């Protein structure tokens, strides 16, 4: 459709192809961090439901360490397997190089920032800190991801690399804010039903 024509004019076919392949690989890489989200919800929710903020604090730390470890190992494995995954696609060398860069950018930050911006934020929500996490996520998506995507991807002509950088900047900012929020203990003041 018209949107596809517009995207091809903005980024070019090889960038669109690389982005499509990279996103398929990203979905595999994201599994470790995403899988830990419900663990945070269950464990932190149980602790807070029992009125045991100290246990919740303990499990926040423990689950965050576990998530970082699992995410790091899994993202490294997926990155190392990327050349194998690309064999399933008919890609030009230029496109393959771009896929490698996109997966590298994603996986480094998926291992380092997403455990805080994703899984840890689920724990905050389970503790009743729902509005804060929602506002931060919405504002960060608009102010960081959208604006940086436009600035880096289109204005500075970085293409899909710029958009990937905008995405990981969004994760990184959320990670810092949610880590600070968890450390502040403010989440302990909410009533969980």
What are these regions, as identified by a protein language model?
Residues 8-27, 94-100, 129, 163-165:
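Interfacial/gating helices of multi-pass transporter permease domains
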Residues 10-13, 50, 126-128, 157:
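Helix-loop interface residues and adjacent transmembrane-helix termini in multi-pass membrane transporters
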Residues 82-83, 145, 149:
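Alpha-helical transmembrane segments of polytopic integral membrane proteins
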Residues 1-6:
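Short, small-residue-biased leader/transition segments that mark boundaries at the very start
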Residues 19-82, 114-138:
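Small-residue-rich hydrophobic transmembrane alpha-helices
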Residues 34-37, 106-126, 132-142, 148, ...:
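Short runs within selected transmembrane alpha-helices of multi-pass transporters and secretion channels
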Residues 44-110, 153-193:
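Short alpha-helical transmembrane segments in multi-pass integral membrane proteins
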């Amino acid at each position: 459709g018209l949107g596809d024509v517009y995207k091809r004019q903005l980024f070019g076919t090889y960038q669109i192809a690389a982005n499509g392949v990279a996103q398929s690989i990203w979905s595999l890489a994201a599994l470790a961090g995403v899988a830990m989200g419900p663990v945070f919800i269950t464990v932190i929710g149980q602790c807070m439901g029992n009125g045991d903020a100290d246990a919740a604090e303990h499990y926040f730390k423990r689950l965050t360490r576990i998530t970082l470890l699992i995410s790091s190992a899994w993202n490294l494995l997926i990155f190392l397997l990327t050349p194998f995954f690309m064999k399933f696609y008919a890609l030009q060398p230029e496109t393959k190089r771009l896929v490698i860069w996109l997966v590298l950018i994603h996986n480094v930050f998926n291992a380092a920032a997403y455990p805080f911006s994703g899984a840890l934020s689920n724990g905050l929500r389970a503790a009743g800190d729902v509005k804060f996490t929602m506002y931060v996520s919405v504002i960060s998506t608009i102010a960081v991801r959208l604006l940086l995507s436009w600035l880096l991807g289109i204005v500075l002509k970085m293409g899909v690399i710029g958009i990937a950088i905008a995405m990981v900047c969004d994760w990184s900012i959320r990670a810092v804010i949610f880590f600070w929020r968890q450390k502040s203990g403010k989440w302990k003041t909410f009533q969980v039903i």
